[in-house]
């Protein structure tokens, strides 16, 4: 099995059966007024933090995030762009995209300001981004640069 296949399978399994110990932390990066993070999103936080600072997220930036995990970062980014498809989440693992979709339903229930359609989930990878040129203001990733090799 190739490196990319192995990585895909690890994240597929993590989407189907959340693995709290898979990565560095389950704590939200930011604590913002009126933002509540569903427990399942915290359990599925397979990142090590954010490469984005909240002060850089002004004027409704169109955002792209690669490696959706349980959707926690996407929810946090949506706090700053409360528009339909204001945040694009990209992942190669179908099961992770589906888990995030489900988690956004829970996020809507506990965050009156949040709508699932603020996040546009897309299948794809960082080497071939399924977005138009010059359409993104802020881009970030979920600690995945180690798997961006062709094989």
Identify the meaning behind each predicted range:
Residues 128, 145-146:
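Active-site micro-motifs of SAM-dependent methyltransferase domains
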Residues 140-144:
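A short beta-strand submotif of the Rossmann-like class I SAM-dependent methyltransferase core
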Residues 127-139:
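A short acidic, Gly/Pro-enriched loop at the edge of an enzyme's catalytic core
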Residues 1-27:
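N-terminal auxiliary segments of SAM/dcSAM-dependent transferases
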Residues 24-62, 73-80:
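Conserved alpha-helix/loop element of class I SAM-dependent methyltransferases that forms part
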Residues 59-128:
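Class I SAM-dependent methyltransferase SAM/SAH-binding core
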Residues 147-151:
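A short, conserved alpha-helix within the catalytic core of class I
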């Amino acid at each position: 099995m190739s490196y990319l296949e192995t990585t895909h399978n690890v994240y597929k399994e993590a989407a189907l059966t959340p693995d709290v110990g898979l990565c560095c932390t389950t704590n939200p990066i930011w604590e913002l007024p009126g933002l509540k993070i569903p427990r399942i999103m915290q359990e599925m936080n397979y990142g090590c933090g954010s490469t984005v600072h909240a002060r850089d997220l002004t004027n409704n930036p169109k955002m792209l995030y690669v490696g959706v995990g349980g959707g926690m970062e996407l929810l946090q980014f949506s706090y700053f762009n409360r528009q339909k498809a204001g945040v694009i989440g990209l992942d190669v693992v179908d099961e992770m995209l589906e888990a995030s979709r489900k988690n956004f339903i829970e996020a809507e229930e506990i965050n009156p300001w949040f709508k699932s359609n603020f996040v546009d989930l897309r299948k794809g990878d960082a080497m071939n981004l399924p977005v138009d040129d010059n359409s993104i203001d802020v881009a970030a990733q979920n600690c995945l640069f180690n798997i961006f090799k062709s094989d």
